[in-house]
């Protein structure tokens, strides 16, 4: 993919496997965030949740992966997200990335995208945007 071939409106969508408690624990280990509400149902219930839930940054990481896979790992110049809803065991998340603009800045060809992560019911857990630098 090059700057000349990417067009405003181009889109990538990726569906991820259903979330599991094991994924939450693995993410805790990778991130160092061992807040027990992400892996202990008793603690999650004590703070008003029906069960454990995924880290917001786990959802963000899935979105970043779609951007990285499309444009390349060195291409990401900016990534900004807003966490909207929690994700739960069994949720099937879909990330959609849509090109919203192209521009040249500081000698780089930049592509702006909007991104969303939503569950199987269409409920958004993450919304944001990113900028990637691409070759001519």
What are these regions (language model features)?
Residues 1-12, 86-136:
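HotDog/MaoC-like acyl-thioester-processing domains
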Residues 16-19, 83, 134:
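Hydrophobic residues in beta-strands and at strand termini
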Residues 69-95:
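Mid-chain, well-packed structural core segment of small domains
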Residues 1-75:
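Hot-dog-fold acyl-thioester-processing enzymes
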Residues 43, 79, 106-107:
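Sparse recognition of residues in long alpha-helices and their boundaries
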């Amino acid at each position: 993919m090059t700057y000349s071939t990417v067009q405003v409106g181009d889109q990538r969508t990726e569906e991820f496997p259903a979330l599991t408690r094991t994924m939450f624990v693995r993410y805790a280990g990778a991130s160092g965030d061992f807040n027990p509400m992400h892996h202990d149902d008793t603690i999650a219930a004590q703070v008003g949740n029906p069960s454990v839930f995924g880290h917001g940054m786990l959802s963000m990481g899935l979105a970043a992966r779609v951007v990285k896979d499309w444009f390349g790992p060195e291409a990401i110049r900016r990534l900004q997200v807003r966490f909207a809803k929690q994700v739960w065991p069994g949720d099937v998340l879909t990330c959609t990335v849509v090109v919203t603009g192209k521009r040249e800045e500081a000698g780089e060809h930049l592509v702006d995208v909007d991104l969303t992560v939503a569950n199987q019911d269409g409920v958004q857990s993450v919304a944001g945007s990113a900028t990637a630098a691409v070759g001519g």
